[in-house]
Amino acid sequence: MSSEEHKKKLLYGVHFLQFLDASGAEKKEELDTSTAILKKKKKPNSLIVTDAVNDDNSTISLSNNTMDTLGLFRGDTVTVRGKKRKETVLIVLADDDLDDGSARINRVVRHNLRVKHGDIITVHPCPDIKYAKRIAVLPIADTVEGLTGSLFDVYLAPYFRDGYRPVKQGDLFTVRGGMRQVEFKVVEVDPPEFGIVAPDTIIHSEGEPIQREDEENNLNEVGYDDIGGCRKQMAQIRELVELPLRHPQLFKSIGIKPPRGILMYGPPGTGKTLMARAVANETGAFFFLINGPEIMSKMAGESESNLRKAFEEAEKNSPAIIFIDEIDSIAPKREKTNGEVERRVVSQLLTLMDGMKARSNVVVMAATNRPNSIDPALRRFGRFDREVDIGIPDPTGRLEILSIHTKNMKLGEDVDLETIAAETHGYVGSDLASLCSEAAMQQIREKMDLIDLDEDTIDAEVLDSLGVTMENFRYALGVSNPSALREVAVVEVPNVRWEDIGGLEEVKRELIESVQYPVDHPEKFQKFGLSPSRGVLFYGPPGTGKTMLAKAVANECAANFISVKGPELLSMWFGESESNIRDIFDKARAAAPCVVFLDELDSIAKSRGGSVGDAGGASDRVVNQLLTEMDGMTSKKNVFVIGATNRPEQLDAALVRPGRLDTLVYVPLPDQASREGILKAQLRKTPVASDVDIEFIASKTHGFSGADLGFVTQRAVKLAIKESISAEIERQKQREAAGEDVKMEDEEEGEDPVPELTRAHFEEAMKTARRSVSDVEIRRYEAFAQSLKNSGGSSFFRFPSANEAADSGNTFGEAGNDDSLYD
C-alpha cells in the first residue's frame, strides 16, 4: 500500500478488520453529517508544504499562478498559518519549478508553524506590517556552548543587515557564521507580535541563553493530530466547543443558545483529558483545569468559593474552556452522599452553570469514567448538554493511535502496524502507548551489551543501530494486556492452536462454522441477513478436551479470552454473585471481540426451583442474571460465550435454548483415529523411537479420554528421564572409580544414554494406566446426546414436489393442524 493510500485510509477510517454489529450486518462506511466539521474546505490560499530549495528563514516560495490567484507580488509580506493556531510572517518569492497549490518553506519555518511535509498551510496578505522599533532575541543554550566573542557582531548584525526581515514574537531562527550554526528565539517585538527589522531597529541580545528543555516543553502541546481512534467523538466535541467559541454569531443568527457543557465518559486511558487539551490548544482558548478532588476543602464554604473563582477567572479571560477532570469526585449523587460539603459543591456547580451568561464564550467540559455516579441534575439540557462516549477504539482507530505513537520512533523494515492493530483487541490509547514504549525498551535491552553504563556518553554507532523490530513488538504484546481487562483474573489470547488438539474433527468443524465464520467472513452473514450464533455448550465426560477447545477457538479468531470458573463467581454477600457476572460481561463487551469461557457451568446454572434453602435462592438469581446478560449480548458487541460442563442434565433449560447457548456440542471420548491424533499431538515435540507403533497404542486404549492418554505419555517421558539421569550417575561413578578427572562443562558430551522414547517406556507406562470414565457414565452421556437428537424436528421433513403440491397434502399429517386446539 502506498503511503498516500495509507493516509487516505487513515483519513476516511477504512476498516481493515471488519466485525459484525448486533444485527449481523457489517457497519457500512457512511459519509454522514456527523463528521462534517472535520472536512477541510478547499480554498485557494490553502497550500501544501514542500521542502525549500534555499535555506532562508524569512521566505516562502510560491508558483507564479498561485501568486496571481492570491494577488501577491515578489517581495510582499504575508502571514502564514499552520497548526495549533501558530502563525508567522514571511516574504514571498517566485519559483517557476513549483506546482500550483504548493509552497516551499524551510525546516525552521516548518518548526515554527508546527507542520511537516504534505501538511496544509494558509497564506494571507499582510500589507500593513510596521517596522519594529526594537526586538529582543536570545540564543538557545546548546547551540552556543563553547562560543566566545560577540554573538551580535558575528551572527545577528550580518543576518539582519539590509535584509528587512519580518519577525514574529516566539519564533525561532538559525544563523550560520564562523563554522557554527546558532539558533535564536525572538522573545519580544515592539510594537507587539509582528515587525520588520529595519536598519534603525534596536536589537537586544543580552540575557541568559534559553534552555532547550524549556523550549521543547512548549512544543509538546497536543493538537488534533495527536489524537487518534475517535474521529466521530472528536467531530462532536469540535462542533460543540469550536463553533460557540469562534463563531458565536452562528447561534445568534439561527436563534438558539450555544451549548454550555460537554460530559465525556469512557474507560480510563481513552484520551478524555488529552482531547480537552487539544481543543484548548487548537482554538487558542484560555484553558482552566480543575482537578476534581483539589477544590475540596475542610473549611466551610471554601470548596464552593474555589469553584466560583474558577468560573470568574474563565469569564474574564473568555473565550475560555473550563475542564473539570474526575467530576464524579465533586458532583456525586446528592441522595447517596453523607458529606454535607459534597452536596453544597454540587448545588454550587448547578447554579454556576445556570448562571453563565448565554454568550459569555465559556464552555465547560468534564470527564469521568463513572457517568452513572454523577448527580442527575447536572446531566440535563442547559448544563451538560451533550454526553460523548469515548469508547475503546476499533482496529482502524488503533492503527491511527499506533501511527501517532510511532511517528518519532525508529522502526525496522519488518514492522507492520496494521497487524499489531488487528491483534490488540480491547487496547485503549494508553495501552498502545505503553506497548510502544515496552517494545522500545526491549530493543534497548537487546543492545545492553554494547552500552557501558559507567561511561558518560554512548557511541553514536550504538545509538544509530537502535531500531524497534517486529520481534520487539511481539515480545511487548506477550507481556501487556488491555487495561480494561486487568481486573479479570484470566485474560489472555491463548497459545493453543487447532493442531495441538488431536482428533475431534467433527467438533472442530462445527466450532469453526459457529465462531470463526462470523469474524472471518462477515460479508456472507450480511448477504443472507443473518445474525451469527452467540454461544456454544460443550458437554461430555471429563478429560475430553473441552477447555482446550475453547482456548483454541479464541486463539484462531484472534479474540481476547476470559476464563471464568463457575464456583468463583458465587459469593456469600447478597447481590454480589449477580454483580460478578454483570462485571465480567461488561468487561467482555469492552474488549470485544471476546470469548467468555464459563467452565463448570453446572455449578452456577442449575435448574431453577430445585435449590431449597439456598442462601435466599442465590443460585436462581445467578441463572436469571446469566440469562439476561446472554440475551443482552446480541444487541451489543462481538461477545461469544462458551460453556463447558460434564453434567448437562442439571443445566437450566432456558440456558440451552436457541439464541443463548444454541449450539450444543457433545465432546465424546476419542475413537481410535482420534486417540492416534491425540498421542501424535502430545508427542510432537518429543523424540520417539521409530519402532514405537502409535497406532497400536491407540488400538489398546479403548475408553481412554484425552487426559488419560496424556497421563500415559507423561509417564513414559518420566521413565525415560529417570533412566537417563540414572545412566549419567552410573557413568560418573565409573569415571571416578577409574581415577579420571570430573568432566568440565565445556568438554564434549558423550553419547546420550537415552536419546528417545522406546517401546519399553510405553510398556512400563501402560501398566499404571487407567480409565477415568466408567462405561456407566459414558452410557449416560450418550443417552443425553441421543435424547437431544430425538427431540429435534422431523428428520423426514421435505418440501412437496410440484405434483404433490397439487394434492395439497399436509406434510405433517393431521397432527400438523393445531388450529382445532383453540376452537
UniProtKB/Swiss-Prot annotation:
Nucleotide-binding keyword on record: yes
UniProt-recorded name of the protein: Cell division control protein 48
Entry binding sites for ATP: P268, G269, T270, G271, K272, T273, L274, N369, H405
GO BP, one annotated term: retrograde protein transport, ER to cytosol
Region entry Disordered, spans: 729-754, 799-823
Assembly and interaction partners: Component of the ribosome quality control complex (RQC), composed of the E3 ubiquitin ligase ltn1, rqc1 and rqc2, as well as cdc48 and its ubiquitin-binding cofactors. RQC forms a stable complex with 60S ribosomal subunits.
Source species of the chain: Emericella nidulans (strain FGSC A4 / ATCC 38163 / CBS 112.46 / NRRL 194 / M139)
Family: Belongs to the AAA ATPase family.
Entry's induction text: Up-regulated when grown with elevated levels of potassium chloride.
GO molecular function: ATP binding; ATP hydrolysis activity; polyubiquitin modification-dependent protein binding
GO cellular component assignments: cytosol; nucleus; VCP-NPL4-UFD1 AAA ATPase complex
A Pfam family per the record: AAA
Function (record text): Involved in spindle disassembly, degradation of ubiquitinated proteins and protein export from the endoplasmic reticulum to the cytoplasm. Acts as a chaperone that collects ubiquitinated substrates. Has a role in the endoplasmic reticulum-associated degradation (ERAD) pathway. Component of the ribosome quality control complex (RQC), a ribosome-associated complex that mediates ubiquitination and extraction of incompletely synthesized nascent chains for proteasomal degradation. Cdc48 may provide the mechanical force that dislodges the polyubiquitinated nascent peptides from the exit channel.
Entry keywords, A to Z: ATP-binding, Cell cycle, Nucleotide-binding, Protein transport, Repeat, Stress response, Transport
The keyword Cell cycle appears for this protein: yes
Biased composition (Basic and acidic residues): 729-742
Amino acid composition bias (Acidic residues), ranges on this chain: 743-754
